[in-house]
Amino acid sequence: MATMKDIARIAKVSTSTVSHVINNSRFVSDEIRDKVMHVVKELNYTPSALARSLKVKETKTIGLLVTATNNPFFTEVVSGVEQYCHQHHYNLILSNTEGDTERLRHNLQTLIQKQVDGLLLMCSDARIQIGKDLNVNLPFVVMDWWPTEEKADKIYENSEYGGYLATKQLIEKGHQHIAIITGNLKKSLAQNRLDGYKKALKEANIPLREDCIIESHFDFEGGKRGMEKVLALQPRPTAVFACSDSIAFGAYQTVWHQGLHIPQDISIIGYDNITLAEYMSPPLTTINQPKAELGKLAVETLLQRIKNPTAKHRTLLLEPQLVWRESVRQLYQEKRG
């Protein structure tokens, strides 16, 4: 493991200069700072746990890494996290990775340099281990499906059950030709919801149509493009499970552009229950993710980890619930052809 002495030797500066650059504790010229930080990156250096423990006091600051802050779901979760940080007299530094691994690495280093007391992670598309691959010795909590992370506190939403619940509700309303618009299936979150969809169809003895599985992205544009493919299917599905409310909103626009109506021509159920869902026309039936509970549990779990870093790691599972509105119509049961 690299040390400050190693960095100083390679950068040809003093150890104290390296310390000032890393801790941002004194003015250092841009030329020397760039040279030191280049070596820091090359050696994948992060301050050791021992060095951090020698701080006089905590900074009362938490770092939050998210995949995308322009997604309404993440925005609402971040708001909840900030609220609970404030209640515990902690500051929050938000960092957006945009799904870029190099940006994730860079932003992590920035947060470490700011001496945050711990990290909250919402980067489900990451394929690296924070503790192992990036040599991070900070307390951290994973707030979503981060499949490669083993030794961490984790708070998951039961996505497979949520996908099952959404599909089952459509089936109970008489729908048998049901399409699904997923996010990127390389993400565990998207795959889990698809697994729930398949489980509900199998349980109801409804044949799986592979052409009804539309892989897209968890955003408005993904919903628009995904719904265009759904409406081109023959026979056309009577209902769609949109794997996020953002996907559902994009799907709404495509339906409107094609002169169709929800739910008369096609039913839609979303996932997340973001604030805008109830203001759509018609109001969106969706699966509620307990966003406030997620934010509260994440902050409380991280603060416990900061106080007791050697405690056994915990995994908490939150259960989604159906929120019934007006975007799904009741169909008469029909024999499948």
UniProtKB/Swiss-Prot annotation:
Protein name (Swiss-Prot/TrEMBL): Ribose operon repressor
DNA-binding region, residues: 4-23
Domain (HTH lacI-type): residue spans on this chain: 1-56
Source species, domain of life: Bacteria
Role: Transcriptional repressor for the ribose rbsDACBK operon.
This protein's UniProt keywords: DNA-binding, Repressor, Transcription, Transcription regulation
GO MF annotation: an example: DNA-binding transcription factor activity
Classification via CDD domains: HTH_LacI, PBP1_PurR
InterPro entries reported for this sequence: HTH_LacI, LacI/GalR-like_sensor, Lambda_DNA-bd_dom_sf, Peripla_BP_I
Gene3D superfamilies documented for this protein: 3.40.50.2300, lambda repressor-like DNA-binding domains
UniProt lineage: Bacteria, Pseudomonadati, Pseudomonadota, Gammaproteobacteria, Pasteurellales
